Amino acid sequence: AAAVPMLLGLSISGVSMVGSDTGGFQEDASAQLFARWFSFSAFTPYFRSHSADDTRPHEPWSFGKNVLDISRHYLRLRYSLIPYIYSAFYRAETEAEPVMKPLFFEWPQDKRLAEVNDEYLFGPHLLAAPVTSPDTLWRHVYLPQGTWYDFWDDTLYHGSSDYLVAAPIEKLPLFVRAGSILPNETARMHTDAERSPVLFLDVYPDENGQACGELYCDAEEGWGYRRGEYSLISFTFQAGSLEVTCENEGFTPPWNDLEVRVHEGIPAAADAADPEEAFTAD
């Protein structure tokens, strides 16, 4: 539980490349702890699994098929989001914008957020709410101002409100800010592997039907980007149309095709004012 506020503190102190040793290196992680830890770490800037000589094996497959499947799922998701994450690091490099930041950093006027240290923004558009307690199937979240999409099923939530959301072992509560465009690609085995030719843009319109996002890409090695050898592309979605603007064209993007996926959103069934109505139990 301490990992989230620790990483957020480092992030706003100017250290953007932060992460935790997934699985730990003291004592033995349980299958449940490792699965939760792995899903959380997939949404941190620095992501790696860890073990030690005097602990049980902490490789994902050492905890059984269920944990292995969960680990594979989040690893693939992480790799598919490389264009989004890499673009967030561009802002960290040029503007000292934290890749992972506490919510009060973005909404300082919301006094509730001064007490929230277990949710955070990952990049400009994703809000992660990791599960840090054992044997948990539901998770309380407070969503800041605006409208939010559930990343997994496109349920819409109104901000400045509390919710109780389902959080089974395989699900990290994850939300997308309305008005966002997420660039992503087909997951690869490793970052040196050949890319799929298709760049995906997932569009999450706000209440006015608008959304925006950006994509940064370069050679991913060397210092050429400091000589202008990079591409910076902005996307604007409005009235059902997408506008693409190249702000810098010093590098040829590695994708040949563009596929746009517009998310419509499904209104949440539960009343935000009474999170207990989010579920019933016999």
Residue ranges and their predicted role:
Residues 46, 104, 234-236, 250, ...:
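Intrinsic disorder/low-structure terminal segments
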Residues 87, 150, 158, 164, ...:
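Compositionally biased, intrinsically disordered low-complexity regions enriched in proline and serine
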Residues 1-170, 177, 221:
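Catalytic-domain carbohydrate-binding cleft regions of carbohydrate-active enzymes
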Residues 273-281:
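Compositionally biased, non-globular sequence tracts
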Residues 171-274:
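Accessory, solvent-exposed terminal regions and/or long lumenal/extracellular loops of proteins
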